[in-house]
Amino acid sequence: AQDETASSVQSGNGANGTDGPAAGTSDVNAAEKSGAMKVKKVLCAPVAGEAAPITEASDEAFAGKMMGDGYIVRPEEGMVYAPEDAAVSFVFPSKHAVGLMSDDGVEYLIHVGVDTVNLNGEGFEAFVKDGDRVKKGDKLIGFDIEYIREHAKSDECIIVFTSLKEGEEIRLTKPGKAEKMDPAAEIVSFN
């Protein structure tokens, strides 16, 4: 089920801002074989847990890349950290999601759990507010993992990139176990 976060971040268009398919639909194997792939940015896991492709998200809107490409982490602990130096674009009043803009202009959302907006902030603690500057490793959101597991559809943390350019996608480089701040994915370009 799509919660308010999805409609607040992007209005249901494809990740590239058109009505076409979402970013990340190119043939990765063909591009890799042709040598056309270029790594544009290494992405660190904001939470410890098991990293997986966004297509495995419990929420259909995220899994379908309606808001953009990304990845998920099934958390082992209830703390989300800043994966890099960035500006805090917004923190939802329900404290279940935070938007960041990196110093190099990449915008992304870190969303804790599925249908957690319905918890109205219960089980969450925000350590940042709109407009804050954060350094890599700073605490962003704390959450009671057991409470989330009991009261929400899923506790997975969804990291979705809302400003990818045409031809860019997220490639998971470390599926499976990821410690916080481990390189877990990359923004790659096939242009």
Where are these regions (language model features)?
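Contiguous, well-folded functional domains in the mature portion of proteins
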Residues: E4-N191
